[in-house]
Amino acid sequence: IVMANKTQLATAGEPQAAVVINNSFIDGLTKQLEEKCKYGLSFPKDYNLSNALMGAYLTLKETKDRNNKPVLESCTSTSIANSLMNMATLGLSVQKKQGYFIAYGGQCQFQRSYFGNITIARRYGMKDIHTEIIYDGDKFKYHIEDGNKILDSHEQDFMNIDNDKILGAYAVVLMEDGTKHLEVMNMKQIKQAWSQGYGYK
């Protein structure tokens, strides 16, 4: 069995080399980030840096650009390293769907997902978040007080719910200290935000 494995490794030299490069690449990034910890960088207490980087690298191996070419071939190694470091310094994990890698013009970028944004917000005192859609025919009212948006009311009739008649959306964030924050976007703003994301048509 041992001989068979050795022969198999010898004939499959390229995949084996990829594994070695993978491990040394991740080890190098891990050491760089651990070195930065001496100068103030910190990670969440439940964050396993090497596991997150290895999981991200495995995800990158399966990720393709819009031309269906593997990202590890079409993107520069510097941009791949930077995207991995960006993910790690945010304390996020692609395996937990907290972000994803995208290729733009030969450059790999890490982009936070909705779950990544929620994870970061919770670290900074967010207790909960509630989101609602505003449809044509809804009665929605808010005011601004000391620079903060305050929700007054949102009355919605079941018959107003129609995906072709969405006027906007809002989110109410409840903080650990009991304060609330309101964010409101009209449909034009939402589409503009979508247009900056990967895969929007």
Place the predicted regions along the sequence by residue.
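Short, Lys/Arg-enriched N-terminal segments with co-localized hydrophobic residues
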Residues: 1-2
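Structured, charged N-terminal subsegments at the starts of enzyme catalytic cores
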Residues: 5-6, 10-16, 20
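Binding-interface segments
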Residues: 17, 21-201
